[in-house]
Swiss-Prot record:
Biochemical pathway: Amino-acid biosynthesis; L-arginine biosynthesis; L-arginine from L-ornithine and carbamoyl phosphate: step 2/3
Organism: Geobacter sulfurreducens (strain ATCC 51573 / DSM 12127 / PCA)
Gene3D superfamilies, A to Z: Argininosuccinate synthetase, chain A, domain 2, HUPs, Single helix bin
GO MF: argininosuccinate synthase activity; ATP binding
InterPro entries named among the record's database cross-references: Arginosuc_syn_C, Arginosuc_syn_N, Arginosuc_synth, Arginosuc_synth_CS, Arginosuc_synth_type_1_subfam, AS_cat/multimer_dom_body, Rossmann-like_a/b/a_fold
Binding site for ATP: A14, Y15, S16, G17, G18, L19, D20, T21, S22, A41, G122
Keyword Amino-acid biosynthesis: yes
Protein name in UniProt: Argininosuccinate synthase
Coiled coil spans: none
Binding-site positions, L-citrulline: Y92, S97, N128, R132, S181, S190, E266, Y278
Source organism phylogeny: Bacteria, Pseudomonadati, Thermodesulfobacteriota, Desulfuromonadia, Geobacterales
PROSITE patterns attached to this UniProt entry: ARGININOSUCCIN_SYN_1 (PS00564), ARGININOSUCCIN_SYN_2 (PS00565)
Keywords, in A-Z order: Amino-acid biosynthesis, Arginine biosynthesis, ATP-binding, Cytoplasm, Ligase, Nucleotide-binding
Family stated for the protein in its record: Belongs to the argininosuccinate synthase family. Type 1 subfamily.
Amino acid sequence: MAKAHKDVKKIVLAYSGGLDTSIILKWLKNEYGCEVIAFSADLGQGDELAPIRDKAIATGADKVYIDDLKEEFVKDFVFPMFRANAIYEGHYLLGTSIARPLIAKRQMEIAKIEGADAVSHGATGKGNDQVRFELAYYHFDPAITVVAPWREWKLNSRQALVNYARKNGIPIPVTKKRPWSSDRNLLHISFEGGILEDTWAEPPENMYVLTKAPEKAPNKPQFVEIEFKNGNAVAVDGEKMSPAQLLAHLNYIGGEHGIGRVDLLENRSVGMKSRGVYETPGGTILREAHSAVEQITMDREVMRIRDSLIPEYARQVYAGYWFSPEREMLQTLIDDSQKCVNGVARVKLYKGHCRTVGRKSETNSLFNLDFATFEKDQVFNQADATGFIKINSLRLRIRSLMQGKK
């Protein structure tokens, strides 16, 4: 055992219950010879969590935490991100990216409670998650020891992992292996790897979990009304709900209509491109409805400036900078812009499409029929537009005149 290993007395492991983190748990026990605490965050994975406690104990965990973080996840992580209308590279609603900071936060809280001197995760050395986890760890404790097995061990193939599992009595799932990996929470489910690495191949229909195939969705559209207060969704069809309940409800409705499927070849933080296929039914509906209420309540120039910040905000979330001062600065500006975003949006769901068909605000509407109508001239003198156009065209006319002299 290396000296660095001897210095570690207790490790808190972010444990999913899958084969990889089960192998990691046993490997930590074997290589570090210390106490290992397994921690699983309930972010809405569903049935996946049921066997985790027994599995962790059977694999060698000295203690197990399974914490229900669904409400905190949606209220303090998903909703702030949706107030920013964040979207990565035009398609990805950041379902995995936004989950990692919360998992790391609770993991570090457990480390403090338990007096652990190290934390560990199951992210590979090629992916984004190692960065997201570890940036968060160091935010909470700059001196924490991070154990990243994928960057240490020599188990560099799937067969090597299987052999290690067999040697150490770790159960290997007997169910037919699906040729892709997945990650699920209340905001989305993601798929990557395996057959999806063929960028020309269409994902098989049996891969999808949350959504019906659009062509098999109901032939009749469904209309949904979503109420917002200060930029946060608070009710669906007039029924008040908690953040997690609301998102779960929209996931079900959206899934029935095939809403929220995305197939993206994205740029990872580490520099390589990677294909991700995502199902985000509730999130897709929320973003559409939120934008609709903004249209009727938000000042034009405030919206323009906020919109210019969306790519940077999304990049920070994707790259793992949730706890950074720059993300917090942007959040302050964005949240100030959301004070007026109070109203209701009506969206139409039909065979994979989510479209706004109405929006209203009783308290913050900036739409005035007298100003906007094409039928009256009582409050807007159309002749005034002549001066407006001439002033705004000045730089273009000067440019044309100067080019004419060349």
